[in-house]
Swiss-Prot record:
Record protein name field: Serine/threonine-protein phosphatase 2A activator 1
Family the UniProt entry places it in: Belongs to the PTPA-type PPIase family.
Coiled-coil parts of chain: none
The keyword Nucleotide-binding is annotated on this UniProt entry: no
Organism: Kluyveromyces lactis (strain ATCC 8585 / CBS 2359 / DSM 70799 / NBRC 1267 / NRRL Y-1140 / WM37) (Yeast)
Length: 353
C-alpha cells in the first residue's frame, strides 16, 4: 500500500470517534483500510515463524527495541508505591510522566532525521500503546496503538520488515507490557471479565496462532490448558506467551477463569481455524467496538479520518458543548455504553454450517 511521505502533511492526532456512528464510519475510512491491509500483511509474514532469540541489527528493530529497552529501564527506576489496593498503583502515573517527557527527544534520536516530520503523529500512537495514565489500565485498544506504531514505521519505508524481526519486536513489546501490568497492577481496560477472550490482549493470539501454521508441531489448541506446555513454548510463540501470562495473573482452573478460551480450544481442532476465528473476532470485538476505538485518534497522514471511497473527510459526531443534558450527543441514537458481555459460547468465534 503506497504512502507518499514527501507530500504527506502531518498533524497532531485528534479524537474523531465519539459514538457508535463514528465507529461505523471508521469501518469505511482510509485508516481502517490501512490497518486491515497491514494486519493481513503481518499475518502472512509471521506464518510458520518462531520468535528468534536474537535479531540482526536494522533501522526498524533498533528503533523499536531501543525504545522498549528505555521504557523497561524506566520501570526499574520507578518502583511501585506500597499500597493495599489490588489494582492501580499510583507510581504508574510517575512512570507515564517520565515516559511522556522523554519520548519526543528519544524519537529525534532514534529516527533518521528525514522522518522528523512524522514524529507529531507517531508519538501519539506510541504514547497510547502503554496503557492509560488516568485510568491506570491496559487493554486491546492500547495493543492496537502499538500495531499502529509498527504500521507507521512500515509506511515510512525505513526498511523492508521481515517476519522474525516483526515477532521479535512484538515479543519485546509484550515483555514490557507484562512487566507494567505486574509492577503497577494495571487494571484490564474495558474487560468483559470471564466472558472475554483475554483481559489485556488479542492481537498476540492472532500472531501466535499464525506462527503454528504450516509447521511440524505437536501443539494442538486444546493444549492451552496444559500449564507446562505453555511455559515451555512461551519464549518462541506469542499464543503460548499470552496463555502463560494468564496463568501468572489468575488462579484456579483454566476453564473457570478463562471459559471462552477454554471452550474455543475444545471446539476448534486446528490452528488454521483458530487463527481465522481470532481474526474474525478481532475485527468485531476490537476494530468495531466503540469502547475500544474511541481512544484511537486520527492525524492527517498515517491514519486520516477520510472516506476510502471518495477520500472526503468523514463526519464527526462530536458531543454538543454546554448541553444541559450531557447524555445527548449531536448524532441521533448515539451510544457510548459498554456493549453486553460476550457469551462463553464459541458461536461468535466460528461459523457453523
Amino acid at each position: 500500500m503506497d504512502f507518499d511521505y514527501e507530500n504527506a502533511k502531518f498533524s497532531m492526532p485528534e479524537k474523531r470517534i465519539f459514538d457508535s456512528q463514528g465507529t461505523l464510519d471508521f469501518q469505511n475510512s482510509v485508516a481502517m483500510v490501512r490497518i486491515q491491509y497491514h494486519l493481513q500483511k503481518y499475518i502472512t509474514l509471521c506464518k510458520g515463524q518462531q520468535i528468534p532469540d536474537t535479531i540482526k541489527e536494522s533501522f526498524f528493530t533498533n528503533i523499536v527495541v531501543e525504545l522498549l529497552k528505555r521504557l523497561s529501564a524506566l520501570i526499574d527506576e520507578t518502583p511501585p508505591e506500597r499500597m493495599h489496593s489490588r489494582y492501580g498503583n499510583l507510581s504508574y502515573r510517575d512512570w507515564q510522566t517520565k515516559f511522556q517527557n522523554q519520548l519526543e527527544n528519544w524519537l529525534h534520536e532514534l529516527l533518521p532525521e528525514k522522518y522528523n516530520n512524522s514524529i507529531i503523529e507517531l508519538s501519539y500512537y506510541i504514547s497510547n500503546a502503554f496503557g492509560s495514565k488516568e485510568r491506570i489500565d491496559y487493554g486491546t485498544g492500547h495493543e492496537l496503538s502499538f500495531l499502529a506504531v509498527i504500521i507507521c514505521l512500515d509506511m515510512l519505508k525505513i526498511e523492508t520488515i521481515k517476519g522474525p524481526a516483526l515477532l521479535y519486536c512484538f515479543n519485546s513489546y509484550y515483555d514490557v507490557i507484562q512487566k507494567l501490568i505486574l509492577t503497577y497492577k494495571l487494571e484490564p481496560a474495558g474487560s468483559h471479565g470471564v466472558w472475554g477472550l483475554d483481559d489485556h490482549f488479542h492481537f498476540s493470539y492472532i500472531l501466535g496462532a499464525t506462527q503454528l501454521l504450516d509447521v511440524n508441531t505437536s501443539l494442538i489448541p486444546k493444549d492451552i490448558s496444559n500449564t507446562r506446555l505453555m511455559e515451555q513454548n512461551s519464549s518462541s510463540n506469542l499464543f503460548c506467551k499470552s496463555i502463560r501470562f494468564i496463568n501468572v495473573v489468575k488462579s484456579g482452573p483454566f476453564s473457570n477463569h478463562s471459559p471462552l478460551l477454554y471452550n474455543i480450544s475444545r471446539s476448534v481442532h486446528t490452528w488454521h481455524k483458530m487463527q481465522q476465528g481470532l481474526i474474525k473476532m478481532y475485527k468485531v470485538e476490537v476494530l468495531n467496538k466503540f469502547p475500544v476505538v474511541q481512544h484511537f485518534w486520527f492525524g492527517t497522514a498515517f491514519f486520516p479520518w477520510t472516506s476510502y471511497g471518495n477520500n472526503h473527510s468523514l463526519p464527526i459526531y462530536q458531543p454538543a458543548e454546554n448541553n444541559d443534558d450531557a447524555d445527548f450527543l449531536t448524532a441521533n441514537n448515539a451510544t457510548t455504553k459498554m456493549p453486553p458481555p460476550l457469551s462463553t459460547s464459541t458461536s461468535r468465534f466460528i461459523h457453523r454450517r
